[in-house]
Amino acid sequence: MPIIKLIASIILLPLISAQFVFAQVTSSVIGKGWANNSVNTIIFRKNSLVSYKGYQYAAYYSEGKKVVLAKRKSGSQEWLTRETDFKGKTEDAHNVISIMVDGEGYLHLAWDHHNNPLHYSRSVEPGSLEMISPTSMIGRNEKELSYPEFYRLPDGNLLFFYRDGGSGRGDLIINKYDTKSKTWARLQDKLISGERKRNAYWQAFVDSKGTIHISWVWRESPDVSSNHDMCYARSDDGGYTWVKSNGEKYSLPITATTAEHALNIPQKSELINQTSMGTDKKGNAFIVSYWRDQNQTVPQYHLIYNLGKGWDSFALDLRKTPFSLSGGGTKRIPISRPQVMIKGAGKKASVLMIFRDEERGGKASALLIPKLGKRKWEITDLTEENLGSWEPSFDTELWREKQILNLFIQRTEQADGEGITDIQPQEVKVLEFKPEF
């Protein structure tokens, strides 16, 4: 039977930096969750947290591998939690939980996917944590899913991105949910095709105008070191037609031959897959990732962007420690993949990047570029504790609507190559602050 309980806990952390101020950082505890690998704290959870009309929702795996759903009034210290009967193979860190709330207030849930059949449900009514029995979306291409991601459009309808097929041979598929009919339909059978030779690892973003931006690296095999290049596309009509940054229309599916290259990055550059992107107020695309430049030994974070006159990039030379991404499975990596948020526009845009680095004690950290054109930055730590293998995920809708940043926080420990570690369940928290920059 489902378990429902109320939890209240809040910690106040003062945090002050020279250029940007987080006057009060609050950390609210939801409960304890599975921590034996990074499945609860992988960056490609879209979403781990989501807000809608004054309420916030969260999801994570319990120690018993069950999906736990949580809800609170925005800013409240009290969480209502519900342990569902849905279980996941938590030993595989790919099998993340993703949630989103549609424009009618229904909660949508996808969980436990790594080259296996669709696991999807939605709430029985708006605002509820009680879910219907698992169901299909459209009944096609639902047997070998990975990387489920929800995105809410300005009209309240949803998009559902996923990979159909295994690593090195998968295609990107998009479904669309209509809130009026409460049904899913296929939007793109193969937006990006690896032609059974490779696959795209993407990150996507829906801007304030509803334009869908997507960027991706190609991978030639299950070996992470075969990642290469950074490509880009966008849709101005809800995902039906796609264009390059110069407005040139794509013939679909997009392939390695036809894709626009934002940046050429060779294989064996320690280029990571599945990071994040965003846009400035004018809809200009920004992408963050990390890789090792040629003739360098240390992978560094990089910012890639296009202000309307072509692609540009620069390295954030923060790091001193080399590492390698060679091999398959989920790696134990000394840094997290980064999340990015942008304020302002053009060369005056401010860029905020959230990340974790063992060189900084494994804390959640924030890097601010106050003015893009100056290419200078500063870093502030957001937590005091070492978060192990944590990667940042956040409430995209709360940030979009109110510029309040809520991060999903949990200490997790990932073994290299898809193993699990010996660690007790760890607290699942939401760290909330409003960056002033």
Language model: regions and residue ranges:
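Positively charged n-region of N-terminal signal peptides that target proteins for export
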Residues: M1-I7
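Bacterial N-terminal signal peptides
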Residues: A8-Q19
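Extracellular, repeat-based ectodomains that mediate carbohydrate processing or recognition
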Residues: Q24-F437
